[in-house]
Amino acid sequence: VPPGGLTXAQXFTIQHIXMT
C-alpha cells in the first residue's frame, strides 16, 4: 500500500502493528 494512499485511520493501525 502506497504511503500517499494511507488514511489517518490506516496509518494509525499500520503504526500499531509495526510497533507490536
Swiss-Prot record:
Catalyses:
an [RNA] containing cytidine + H2O = an [RNA]-3'-cytidine-3'-phosphate + a 5'-hydroxy-ribonucleotide-3'-[RNA]; an [RNA] containing uridine + H2O = an [RNA]-3'-uridine-3'-phosphate + a 5'-hydroxy-ribonucleotide-3'-[RNA]
Q: Which controlled-vocabulary keywords does the entry list? A: Endonuclease, Hydrolase, Lyase, Lysosome, Nuclease
Catalytic-site annotation from UniProt: H16 (proton acceptor)
Enzyme class comes to lyase
Which Gene Ontology cellular-component terms appear in the entry? lysosome
Q: Which GO terms describe its molecular function?
A: lyase activity; ribonuclease A activity
Cellular localization per UniProt: Lysosome; Cytoplasmic granule
EC number(s) per entry:
4.6.1.18
Family statement: Belongs to the pancreatic ribonuclease family.
Q: How does it assemble?
A: Interacts with and forms a tight 1:1 complex with RNH1. Dimerization of two such complexes may occur.
What's its job? This is a non-secretory ribonuclease. It is a pyrimidine specific nuclease with a slight preference for U. Cytotoxin and helminthotoxin. Possesses a wide variety of biological activities.
Name by which UniProt lists this protein? Non-secretory ribonuclease
Q: In which organism is this protein found?
A: Sus scrofa
Gene name tied to this protein: RNASE2
